[in-house]
Structure formats: structure tokens, C-alpha cells
């Protein structure tokens, strides 16, 4: 009985372990595509799938009729077994646009093209604590909670940037196009956006975040923080477009659509979690937010009196889509996950440093806020960058460190979910009602080997009992 048990269980364990390893070693979409094209069966299915996608916009004959639909469905199912299906991209990578083009061609085919879902970017899983260790201008909050500097932290951050060669180089690179006026225009908005993306992609977070998320005690500081991205050029326009129309425009651009999906994924609020973030990771949320800067969906602080942010849009002329529009806009304005992440960076705290419980479990692999997107005609194929068809509150770390160092003080700089009003100020409550949906399946198999070991132990106990 014992040998029979080993005979059946060990091969299964080996299979699961190998699957776990391969799932964690996920290829980027450029490499996965190259790998697929070298394999005849995969290449054939991939080309078929691309024809199916193209057919949605050009009425290609392959997409008409039941036989064609079956062929498209067969190609989809076959590619689910390939590394191309689970490929991801890295923000700022050398071939990012090409990688995202491949990802969305697969994603639109396998999941549909009407909703933003999972992020196309490989998870970074960084921690704010990694940034704090290298930030020279943030006060030692843990040791001197009562004695926070009365100076301008945003000004200090700008000075620190000028002392760093990389930060100074890329900051100057965006200041010039964002402040140089053109004929009949305030600036060259396209060049300004591109330079801003490079700044947040290339400059270490200790400097870029220091300027964008600096903690403030007065209007002079908050206004400097709001002016970080030169909003007169990168953010403001003569008129505010409807937010759903702006989202439609964003969706036709590989970079913008990807950064927006990343923001939905990593800044998803969850009131039951320790941090008010579903992902329980402030650093990933701040990275996703900063990734939107330099796209048509560029967000910024609404005013100098709160942490509320929003893209340059409103919900006028929404008609029957007013509810969807407000839901989209409020995901930015009333996002307690993002607000707590900004607070945490300014305070020098990090929920993941003391997290006493695992993230909230949901019934889906990844829960994101999904918004209806109207189908729009796509630009000409080949155009660059265009898509053709718990237990403790967020302040607990500060409190714990205060007790450890025996320093008295207030933790009023860190607010909980109920402290935020619609304008981001203390004293009112806000709640964001969102819809959820499942994302593409991931390769998370880490619990399976444990289950197999448990089953093996049980079978061994039974076999030993029988032999005795």
C-alpha cells in the first residue's frame, strides 16, 4: 500500500512543482511572441488569432460564419497553453510599446475588448520602506513625530533632485518643453508628456516621489506639489472633456490604456483591508499613479487644500452614462487607497512593514474596477503607440514605532477611511461603489504542493495503520 501511494503521488507532486516554477518565470510578451513564432503549431494559431482580431474591425472573411468562429475559438484555447497567454511587460522596458501591442492583441482576443481588466505589467512588489532608506530629505518621523519640520518639504525635495545627476537631467528635460510656449499654444504638449513619462520611468522613486507626494503643512507647499508636473501644459486645457470620452481616447493608445489598467489594478480600494487597498501595497499604487502622468489621462491634485486627484475631465453631457462617468471620476477623487498611500509616503510609514494579516481574499483572481468603454474606430494600423482593433489602521506603524522609541506625539498626519470627505479633508466619510470582475487566470500554484504533502501524509498514516 505504501509503495503504491508513492507510485501515484510523487509524479503528481513533481508535476505541480514544475508548474509552479514555470509560472513564476513568466516571459515578457516580446520574448514569448518570438518563442511562439519559432514553434509551428503555436505560430499557426497565433496568426489565426491575429486575423480574428483584425477581422473585428475590417470585416475579414475569417470572422464570418460558424466555421470561422470555431476556428478562432480553437486558436484561443490552444494559445492558453502557451507562455504567450500569461506574458507581461515591464514599465519603461526597451520595447515597451511593442510588448504592450502583443499583450493587448492577445488580451482583446481572449477576454473581449469592452472592459479594462488586469494590468499588462509584471508586478513589481516593491515596498515604501525600500525608498525610505534612501530618502535624504524626509524627516525622521519615527523618532520625532512631534517635531516635523516646519519647512517646505516639496522645496526640499526639489533641492535634493538638483543634487542628483539623473533627477536633475530628466527634470530639466521636461521643464523645458512644458514651459516653452508655441504659436497659438501654451506649450508643446506632446513633447511635455513624453518628457514627463521619461522622468517618472527613469528617475529613482526616492526623488520623483519626493516631489510628487511630499507632505505639506501649508498652502505654499501644497501649491508647489500641485505645480510639480507643470499642469498649465501637461494637465489643463481650454475645455474639460467628458471623462468617458477621455477614457475612450486613452484606450486607443497602448501606453495610456496599459497605465490606466495598472492604476485600476494596484489602487483598487478595499475598506476591509488594513491599508484600504485590495493589494495591500502602497508602493505599487504610487507607481501605478505616477505611470499615468504624461498620458492623455494625466491626473493631478485638484486644488491646494486636499489630496484629491483627478484627470482633466468632468461628467457634463454624460446623458444616460452619468452613473458610469461619476464612478470613473470618483475612482480618482475619492480613492482612499491612493490617499493613504500618499499619506504613508509623506509620513514615512508602510503598511507592509507590519502587516499582521494577509490581504483580503476575494472570489476572483484579481478584482478591479471595470468601466464601460464605447467601441470607437481605431486609427490606421502601424501608427506608433496606437492600438488597432484586518486589524490595525494605516497609522499603526507610526504608533508602534513611537512606543518603541518612547517618543510621544500625534499621528494625525495619517488618516483612516472614515476621515476622508469628498474634498479629501478630515471630518466626513466617503464610499466608492465599484463593480468587480475576474481577470485572466494567473499561475499561482504555491498552495498546491502543500496540499499534496498533506494528502501524502494522510495516505502514509492509513497505510501504516493497515500494515499494523
From Swiss-Prot:
Q: Which residues are modified by glycosylation?
A: 59, 347, 406
sequence repeat positions: 25-113, 150-238, 239-342
Cystine pairs annotated here are: 36-42, 154-214, 161-167, 178-192, 187-233, 216-221, 243-313, 250-256, 267-285, 277-337, 315-325
- Lipid addition (GPI-anchor amidated serine) is recorded at 430
Q: Where is the signal peptide?
A: 1-24
Q: Where in the cell is it found?
A: Cell membrane; Golgi apparatus, trans-Golgi network; Endosome; Endosome, Multivesicular body
User: What are the recorded Gene Ontology BP terms?
Assistant: anatomical structure morphogenesis; cell migration; cell surface receptor protein tyrosine kinase signaling pathway; glial cell-derived neurotrophic factor receptor signaling pathway; kidney development; male gonad development; nervous system development; neuron projection development
The way this protein sits in the membrane is described as:
Lipid-anchor; GPI-anchor
Main subcellular localisation: membrane
Q: Name one GO molecular function term.
A: glial cell-derived neurotrophic factor receptor activity
Tissue pattern of expression reads: Expressed in the brain, in hippocampal neurons (at protein level). Isoform 1 and isoform 2 are expressed in heart, brain, lung, liver, kidney and testis.
Alphabetical GO CC annotations of the entry are: axon; external side of plasma membrane; extracellular space; extrinsic component of membrane; Golgi apparatus; multivesicular body; neuronal cell body; plasma membrane
- Positions annotated as pro-peptide in this chain are 431-468
Keyword Disulfide bond tagged: yes
| Keywords for the protein's UniProt record, in alphabetical order | Cell membrane, Disulfide bond, Endosome, Glycoprotein, Golgi apparatus, GPI-anchor, Lipoprotein, Membrane, Receptor, Repeat, Signal
Classification via InterPro entries: GDNF/GAS1 (IPR016017), GDNF_alpha (IPR037193), GDNF_rcpt (IPR003438), GDNF_rcpt_A1 (IPR003503), Glial_neurotroph_fac_rcpt_a1/2 (IPR017372)
Assembly information from the UniProt record: Interacts with GDNF ligand and RET: forms a 2:2:2 ternary complex composed of GDNF ligand, GFRA1 and RET receptor. Interacts with SORL1, either alone or in complex with GDNF. Interaction between SORL1 and GFRA1 leads to GFRA1 internalization, but not degradation.
- What is the role of the protein in this entry? Coreceptor for GDNF, a neurotrophic factor that enhances survival and morphological differentiation of dopaminergic neurons and increases their high-affinity dopamine uptake. GDNF-binding leads to autophosphorylation and activation of the RET receptor.
Q: Which family does it belong to?
A: Belongs to the GDNFR family.
The cross-references to PANTHER family, in alphabetical order and at most eight, read: GDNF FAMILY RECEPTOR ALPHA-1, GDNF RECEPTOR ALPHA
**Protein name as it appears in the record:** GDNF family receptor alpha-1
Which species expresses this protein natively? Mus musculus (Mouse)
Q: What lineage does UniProt assign to this protein's organism?
A: Eukaryota, Metazoa, Chordata, Craniata, Vertebrata
Recorded name of the encoding gene: Gfra1
Amino acid at each position: 500500500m505504501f509503495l503504491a501511494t508513492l507510485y501515484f503521488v510523487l509524479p503528481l507532486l513533481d508535476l505541480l512543482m514544475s508548474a509552479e516554477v514555470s509560472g513564476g518565470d513568466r516571459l515578457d510578451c516580446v520574448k514569448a511572441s518570438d518563442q511562439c513564432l519559432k514553434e509551428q503549431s503555436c505560430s499557426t494559431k497565433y496568426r489565426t488569432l491575429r486575423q480574428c482580431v483584425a477581422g473585428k474591425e475590417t470585416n475579414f472573411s475569417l470572422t464570418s460564419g460558424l466555421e470561422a468562429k470555431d476556428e478562432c475559438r480553437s486558436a484561443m484555447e490552444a494559445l492558453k497553453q502557451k507562455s504567450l497567454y500569461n506574458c507581461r511587460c515591464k514599465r519603461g522596458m526597451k520595447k515597451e510599446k511593442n510588448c504592450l501591442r502583443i499583450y493587448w492583441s492577445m488580451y482583446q482576443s481572449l477576454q473581449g475588448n469592452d472592459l479594462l481588466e488586469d494590468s499588462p505589467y509584471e508586478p513589481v512588489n516593491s515596498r515604501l520602506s525600500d525608498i525610505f532608506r534612501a530618502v535624504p530629505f524626509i524627516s525622521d518621523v519615527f523618532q520625532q513625530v512631534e517635531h516635523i519640520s516646519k519647512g517646505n518639504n516639496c522645496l526640499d525635495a526639489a533641492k535634493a533632485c538638483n543634487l542628483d545627476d539623473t533627477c536633475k537631467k530628466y527634470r530639466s528635460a521636461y521643464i523645458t518643453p512644458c514651459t516653452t510656449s508655441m504659436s497659438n499654444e501654451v506649450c508643446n504638449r506632446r513633447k511635455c508628456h513624453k518628457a514627463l513619462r521619461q522622468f517618472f520611468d527613469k528617475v529613482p522613486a526616492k526623488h520623483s516621489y519626493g516631489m510628487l507626494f511630499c507632505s505639506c503643512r501649508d498652502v505654499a507647499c501644497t501649491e508647489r506639489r500641485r505645480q510639480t508636473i507643470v499642469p498649465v501644459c501637461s494637465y489643463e486645457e481650454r475645455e474639460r472633456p467628458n471623462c468617458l470620452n477621455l477614457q475612450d481616447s486613452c484606450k486607443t493608445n497602448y501606453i495610456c490604456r496599459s497605465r490606466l489598467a495598472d492604476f485600476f489594478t494596484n489602487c483598487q480600494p478595499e475598506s476591509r483591508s488594513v491599508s484600504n487597498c485590495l493589494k495591500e501595497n502602497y508602493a505599487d499604487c504610487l507607481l501605478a499613479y505616477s505611470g499615468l502622468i504624461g498620458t492623455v489621462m494625466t491626473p493631478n491634485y485638484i486644488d491646494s487644500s486636499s489630496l484629491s486627484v483627478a484627470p482633466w475631465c468632468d461628467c457634463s453631457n454624460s446623458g444616460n452614462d452619468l452613473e458610469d462617468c461619476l464612478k470613473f471620476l470618483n475612482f480618482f477623487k475619492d480613492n482612499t487607497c491612493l490617499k493613504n498611500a500618499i499619506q504613508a509616503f509623506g509620513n514615512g510609514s508602510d503598511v507592509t512593514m507590519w502587516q499582521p494579516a494577509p490581504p483580503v481574499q476575494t472570489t476572483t483572481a484579481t478584482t478591479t474596477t471595470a468601466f464601460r468603454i464605447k467601441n470607437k474606430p481605431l486609427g490606421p494600423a502601424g501608427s506608433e503607440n496606437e492600438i488597432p482593433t484586518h486589524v490595525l489602521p494605516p497609522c499603526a506603524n507610526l504608533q508602534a514605532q513611537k512606543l518603541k522609541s518612547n517618543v510621544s506625539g500625534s499621528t494625525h498626519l495619517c488618516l483612516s477611511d472614515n476621515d476622508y470627505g469628498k474634498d479629501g479633508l478630515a471630518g466626513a466619510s466617503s464610499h466608492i461603489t465599484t463593480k468587480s470582475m475576474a481577470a485572466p487566470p494567473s499561475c499561482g500554484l504555491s498552495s498546491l504542493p502543500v496540499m499534496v504533502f498533506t494528502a501524502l501524509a494522510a495516505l502514509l498514516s492509513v497505510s501504516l495503520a493497515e500494515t499494523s
